[in-house]
């Protein structure tokens, strides 16, 4: 385990072992101020972690870890621009995109301000009708072409903050499967459709393929040559490559190597957000994230929301044995949050070696999954309540949910709070026996109604889903991910594991096209390739 000194690790191990025989609800009896004491508040968010299997002594030991592992200093290194991405010898300054520690980076801050100014001007020009398509019709739809960080973040934000009065309707295409693009474009009009092509190198296979096919769709709709540029925006470092699609330099926006893809929605990657929701909403999103940055920089470990979130995951994963973490947002607006967090956490912390190449002896990131409530209640909550797997969870509840049927929103909140209680209390054996007898089962068969409970989870309350609170929520998870990486002794800013599949896919292209029948590959894969070739022989 990366935790030092060893005595601290041993103390946590012993505390976890002692707590296994205790009930979470019993801790409320022994800790009178538990409800108010086990919470953090920041930027419109409240983290209530009182329903974790954790007592004061164990919590204090965990908080000591934040000092011994120098988490505050690690955050100062992050926002200060030190080389935290050691394998690629780069800083990770996504916080600078929202104005955090801008005084420490005057040159980079100037570049960001210039880019934001250009973005705002283009958005205003399109919304006002000054910039139109080739036939002088105003744009009605914007299609974001990207994958990974250039898709998941903007998609989450646009879905969460969408209103029927949005200036442009946003669409997202990431999959190389042509059904994704074709299905998206089917109801759209080429004359009123704008594309944002997001690729740092303009060589990402999925994005390049979709961009070429999208341009073909525009051409089939009568938009040719230089006129294509009116319908295209590129977020890339490769301006010369963009020009071959007739995208003028003023419609190309930069990406910097000190911003990783999964942290990039705050950059020009967020153009689809601004185009769909308006520049003010995008700026408010940045402001919310900045507020959370300021909280993270200044709050003590006891009250530091992302720091506590990271320590809780360390506690659950490494000391209480939780091997998955489920995120359950009780807001349809946040349905894409688990997808976004999967990339953020598992691509960042799904590592097995240290930055110096040492094989780690401890687990790193847990598997993260989830969906919007109450959908999950009718699919996998059965496993959560009565399965054999150990897990931890975040239940997310906005207090104010906007317009709509008040009774339905009350019911949604009731389900959220019920699922915040049920995993903790469960259904004891005696209650299960009584229920079984009432339903005509004998005592032995009545065990199927028992639910052990005692599952730890956090309740994360949002005042409402607004640009500010959503920006803060995303930033909180970003910083949690970074702090956990520091605790685990790994680099969260590279992703070498993504490359192997890409390399093999390149070989498979030659096999599937019939250009290389002598490639060395296992028989099962070659048999599947031959089946595909036979099915697509025409």
What positions do the PLM features span?
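Helicase-primase coupling helices
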Residues: 363, 367-464
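Conserved active-site and cofactor/substrate-binding residues in soluble primary-metabolism enzymes
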Residues: 7, 33, 53, 57, ...
């Amino acid at each position: 385990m990366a935790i030092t000194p060893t005595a601290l690790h041993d103390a946590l191990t012993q505390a976890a072992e002692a707590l296994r025989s205790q009930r979470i609800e019993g801790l409320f009896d022994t800790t009178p101020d538990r409800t108010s004491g086990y919470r953090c508040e920041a930027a419109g968010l409240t983290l209530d972690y009182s329903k974790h299997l954790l007592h004061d002594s164990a919590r204090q030991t965990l908080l000591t870890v934040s000092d011994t592992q120098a988490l505050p200093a690690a955050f100062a290194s992050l926002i200060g621009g030190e080389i935290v991405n050691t394998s690629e010898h780069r800083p990770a300054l996504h916080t600078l995109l929202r104005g955090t520690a801008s005084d420490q980076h005057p040159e980079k801050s100037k570049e960001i301000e210039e880019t934001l100014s250009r973005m705002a001007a283009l958005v205003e020009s399109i919304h006002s009708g000054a910039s139109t398509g080739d036939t002088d019709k105003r744009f009605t739809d914007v299609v974001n072409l990207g994958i990974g960080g250039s898709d998941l973040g903007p998609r989450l934000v646009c879905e969460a903050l969408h209103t029927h009065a949005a200036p442009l309707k946003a669409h997202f295409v990431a999959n190389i499967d042509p059904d994704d693009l074709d299905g998206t474009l089917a109801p759209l009009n080429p004359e009123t459709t704008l594309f944002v092509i997001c690729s740092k190198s303009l060589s990402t296979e999925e994005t390049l393929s979709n961009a070429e096919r999208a341009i073909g769709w525009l051409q089939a709709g009568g938009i040719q040559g230089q006129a294509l540029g009116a319908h295209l925006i590129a977020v890339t470092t490769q301006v010369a490559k963009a020009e071959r699609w007739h995208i003028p330099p003023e419609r190309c926006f930069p990406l910097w190597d000190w911003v990783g893809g999964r942290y990039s929605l705050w950059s020009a990657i967020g153009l689809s957000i601004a185009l769909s929701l308006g520049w003010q909403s995008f700026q408010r999103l940045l402001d919310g994230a900045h507020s959370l940055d300021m909280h993270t920089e200044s709050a003590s470990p006891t009250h530091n929301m992302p720091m506590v979130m990271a320590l809780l995951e360390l506690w659950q994963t490494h000391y209480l044995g939780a091997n998955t973490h489920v995120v359950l947002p009780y807001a349809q607006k946040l349905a894409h949050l688990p997808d976004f967090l999967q990339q953020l956490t598992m691509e960042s912390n799904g590592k097995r070696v240290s930055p110096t190449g040492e094989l780690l002896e401890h687990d790193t990131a847990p598997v993260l999954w989830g969906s919007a409530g109450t959908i999950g209640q009718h699919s996998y909550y059965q496993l959560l309540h009565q399965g054999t797997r150990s897990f931890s969870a975040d239940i997310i509840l906005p207090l104010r949910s906007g317009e709509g049927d008040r009774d339905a929103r009350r019911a949604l909140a009731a389900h959220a709070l019920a699922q915040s209680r049920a995993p903790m209390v469960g259904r004891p054996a005696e209650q299960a026996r009584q229920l079984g007898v009432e339903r005509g089962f004998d005592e032995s068969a009545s065990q199927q109604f028992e639910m052990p409970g005692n599952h730890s989870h956090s309740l994360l309350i949002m005042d409402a889903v607004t640009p500010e609170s959503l920006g803060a929520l995303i930033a909180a998870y970003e910083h949690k991910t970074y702090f956990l990486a520091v605790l685990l002794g790994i680099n969260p800013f590279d992703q070498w594991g993504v490359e192997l599949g890409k390399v093999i896919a390149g070989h498979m292209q030659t096999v599937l096209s019939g250009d290389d029948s002598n490639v060395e590959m296992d028989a099962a894969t070659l048999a599947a390739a031959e089946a595909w070739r036979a099915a697509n022989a025409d």
